[in-house]
Amino acid sequence: MSVSIKPLEDRIVVRPLEAEQTTASGLVIPDSAQEKPQEGEVVAVGPGRFEDGNRVPVDVAVGDVVIYSKYGGTEVKTGGTEYLVLSARDVLAIVVK
C-alpha cells in the first residue's frame, strides 16, 4: 500500500483496524457506543530521531500490526482513507501472530 504521507523523525503512519461491530454474544454495537480502535497496521515509518548526534531507528516496520495509546497521535485523511500519525513513543506493542 502506497501512502502519500512521509513521516518525519520517529513518527509512524498507521491505518487503524476496524472496530468490532458486534459483541461476542452477537449484539450489534452502534457507532456512537464503539470505542476508538487502538490497533492498526503500520503503513509508513520515519527515519528515526537524533540523540547525542546519532540517529535512533524506529522499532516498528511497515506491515507491523501495533497497539497504540488510546489518545495518541493525529488523525489525517488522504485519498479517502483515514490514518493516524503517531510518535513511536505512542506505540505500546507489536502484535505477533
Swiss-Prot record:
Q: Quote the SUPFAM superfamilies the UniProt record gives.
A: GroES-like
A GO cellular component annotation in the UniProt record: cytoplasm
Pfam families hit by this protein: Cpn10
Q: Which GO terms describe its molecular function?
A: ATP binding; metal ion binding; protein folding chaperone; protein-folding chaperone binding; unfolded protein binding
**PROSITE patterns documented for this protein:** CHAPERONINS_CPN10
Q: Which domain of life is it from?
A: Bacteria
The main location class comes to: cytoplasm
CDD domains in alphabetical order: cpn10
User: Could you tell me which InterPro entries the record lists for this protein?
Assistant: Chaperonin_GroES, Chaperonin_GroES_sf, Chaprnonin_Cpn10_CS, GroES-like_sf
UniProt keywords, alphabetically: Chaperone, Cytoplasm
The protein's location, in the record's own words, is: Cytoplasm
From the UniProt record, list the coiled-coil ranges: none
> Known Gene3D superfamilies for this protein?
GroES chaperonin
Q: Which residues cross the membrane?
A: none
Q: Name one GO biological process term.
A: chaperone cofactor-dependent protein refolding
Q: Which family does it belong to?
A: Belongs to the GroES chaperonin family.
Q: How does it assemble?
A: Heptamer of 7 subunits arranged in a ring. Interacts with the chaperonin GroEL.
Cited function: Together with the chaperonin GroEL, plays an essential role in assisting protein folding. The GroEL-GroES system forms a nano-cage that allows encapsulation of the non-native substrate proteins and provides a physical environment optimized to promote and accelerate protein folding. GroES binds to the apical surface of the GroEL ring, thereby capping the opening of the GroEL channel.
Full protein name: Co-chaperonin GroES
